[in-house]
Amino acid sequence: MAYARSYDPESVGLRVLSGRPLRWRHRLAGIVVVASDIDADAGVAAIWLARRAGWPIAVNGVCQFERVGNSWQCVSGGGTGEKLPLAGRPSASRSGPASMMTHVSSGAGRSRADREALGLQQDPAKMGWVAYETFRVAAEVAHLQVGARRIKVPQHGYVIVAWKAPPSYVSPPRPPIAAVSDDGLRLTELGPNDHLDSLTWASLQGD
């Protein structure tokens, strides 16, 4: 079918990174950019793509990129056939504290820049990681604070965080992430190895 042939995640991601709008064929196929994050200092990026509701074949996936030399190169990509509802963003005041920051997905791939720098000496212990995590946050959250970086949350509440981690044999932990309101209040936090954010954890301890 035409809408199936017109979707190439890597090419769509590269258009987003270059600041260009999606091609007509991408829009015709119902493809939308759910969220994106570029850490220019680390030279990594992640683009979250989906297909609008109503299409018979769902698209929901992330492409990771790393700057190698003067160009962006795809590190990894993947996704599911699950539909992603872009409407009905929850409010933590109505839905409860667990909806303030909900983990959706994550992924990581070996650094292409490190791989090229090593040449024939392909030792995984010397290769860093390019990683991402996706979340849906409540309506009370305006942005995520990741170190010195501020990542604005789109209106639908889905947001993605990209980072680069140093070499290790295992997938890297995330950087500390805080969900922040419009007035600068830290609503909840998620540490490098946490399975639950601080607000959800506090609500469980209080029960």
Question: For each predicted feature, which ranges?
Answer:
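Short beta-strand micro-motifs in enzyme catalytic cores
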Residues: 43-47, 131-133
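A general sequence property marking short-to-moderate contiguous segments
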Residues: 4-25, 45-123
